[in-house]
């Protein structure tokens, strides 16, 4: 393997790099800070980026930084997610068996979240990955879920994460206006520029333990 050839202790460019070792651009850190605010204030947020721009890395970092004594994080990633399976997925993660009808499952989830907030004194954060693949019916359901106690409070923070088309080809359209009006924060991760790309590579090579110069300036320009 190339790791031995270059004297590496760890593989530098893989998914399982520890969150604290991941490179963070200025845009990444700003978005991470915004998501922390979203979690604390129990808001509805949308995060988009082109493939390879750091969405999965952001989610991992966001999850790792939320204090476990203060938050319960629920995560779903299913391109065929329907409203019924949305509630079932969340209730399963909370250790509950969902009821058959969607409305009953929604009330069941809201009641459980009230217990979590009132008894455990924790806040719930729901992350939905690959959200650009969700159908309109499911996206609409988030609006209904967050309309709670006569719209006086949000039962949880909801973070939709997806490719750029989630915003450009769906949420910006008039048919999604009701959903868009509920969104409290929209963030996008841009492509890394030349300087950031060099810093990204240097950071991961440092994590690998490699002391050799592997990437020349010309190679970095090509990347």
Which ranges hold each PLM region?
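A short, basic N-terminal segment
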Residues: 1-41
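Conserved NTP-binding/hydrolysis module of P-loop NTPases
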Residues: 8-11, 71-73, 81-100
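Conserved catalytic network of the ASCE P-loop NTPase/AAA+ motor domain
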Residues: 37-40, 65-69, 115-120, 132-137, ...
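Walker A/P-loop nucleotide-binding motif
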Residues: 41-61
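Short hydrophobic/aromatic beta-strand immediately N-terminal to the Walker A/P-loop
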Residues: 45-48, 75, 127
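Walker A/P-loop
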Residues: 56-72
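Mid-core helix/loop region of P-loop NTP-binding domains shared across ATPases and GTPases
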Residues: 82-85, 96-141, 150-154, 192-197, ...
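Helix-loop-helix "sensor" segment of P-loop NTPases
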Residues: 115-119, 150, 159, 167-222
